[in-house]
Amino acid sequence: MRTTITVGIAVLMLVAASSARYVVSREGTHSAATEFAPISRLMNDAIAAEKLPGGVVVIGHGGKTVFHQAYGSRKLAGEQGLDGLPAPAEPMTEDTVFDIASLTKPLATATAVMQLYEQGKVALDEPVQSYLPDFNAANDAERQRVTVRMLLTHTSGEPIDVDLADPWGLGRADKAEGIHRALTMPLQSAPGGVFRYADINYILLGALIEKLTGQTEDEYARQNIFTPLGMTETRYLPAASLVPRIAPTAVDDQSSADPGKNPHFGVLLRGTVHDPTARRMGGVAGHAGVFSTAHDVGLFAQALLDRLADRPSRFPLRQATLAVMTSPQQPGHRPGQVEAANDALRKAAATTPNTMDPLLAPHYPAIEGQELFGFSWDIDTAFSKPRGLIFPVGSFGATGFTGTSLWLDPGSDTYVILLANAIHLRGSPPISALRGDVATAAAQALRL
């Protein structure tokens, strides 16, 4: 039986507050009337509170797109237009192209690694140095213990990012330098012992993909993931023709102490990846760099759910592989951890409700010290707020720094996408709570 978590009073009030009904179906048919007005209220209130300039929400359920709506602005008034001069605001549209930031990890890199796993070219518990010898050129005993599994689950001991203090890659992109720095950064903790979300892990996985395939990651992902799924507007290095529809992020502020070392200093990033490491590497890296639309991310999500459910699907991995990829895979994972986490959430909701703010009642993770992570997919960690209150532990998702998120629940055959360029609004607070609120409202609207 699917686990259901008791919902706080605030959620019930949120849903009851609106009588408007919205139903969208890509097949052009109407499903049972479903109240999605609370999602619009959440998004519009967040925009009014200057938490983000705008965004696009897509909800899939039962094999259909049941909600697809754009909100707010794609570009704020007074920010640089396509000609680099201050320009009027641009409305957000459903077909806006976003820098999806770390959603690159599951949509491109981890999927590619698991394809290589299916082909017998990668073993999950093989040391990284077997594929990338320069990872351990000095034959260090600790580095020898780092495996592909540890990179995929952020348990390698690597620090969060490479050193960006000097201006490497600013005047001219230098991917080789970025990979070299990732290969040689000292470990911050013992391999397999600590969950630390680190971009270095996926920079290394990107390098592994390129070495084993002989292709750049953008070429590989386009041919083997995006094209088979029909994701025609998803790619690294977006074409110039897409730029008018791309949501700008922030101005390039790298080398602020000496702007003369960065020829793009002060330029609004639009069609150029925001992540500074990926940008210095030329826009193609394992941890960030992909641009996409909410529609295309929905194609990926629906194909994934279809494959897991053993329905006809073009998803480029086998069902068994996906089942592994989307379940706890961190070193030391064991049966029963997901069930224990859901039990803990039920008990917390029943015995220690947060009466000041019911939306914050759950703990993330549900059990302190038990962080559950699949291969690129968050299951129950400190980053799991986009799950909301109703989807159980065992559902999974991912987020991107620019303001993007995707959460999927195979148990209810549902996915929730929120794509935004939150960082375009300078100084705006994180939108972690908004992501969770939207997921909760979506699940409640679907009567899950």
Model-derived segments and their meaning:
Residues 1-4:
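Positively charged n-region of N-terminal signal peptides that target proteins for export
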Residues 12-30:
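Bacterial Sec-dependent signal peptides at the C-terminal "C-region" and cleavage site
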Residues 32-98, 121-123, 138, 180, ...:
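Short, conserved catalytic-motif segment at the N-terminal edge
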Residues 37-44, 57, 63, 99-125, ...:
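Active-site SXXK
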Residues 124-139, 227-229:
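Short, glycine/proline-biased beta-turn/loop segments that scaffold the active-site neighborhood
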Residues 289, 395, 402-415:
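Short, surface-exposed beta-strand/loop micro-motifs that present aromatic residues
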Residues 422-434:
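A short acidic/glycine-rich loop-to-helix N-cap element
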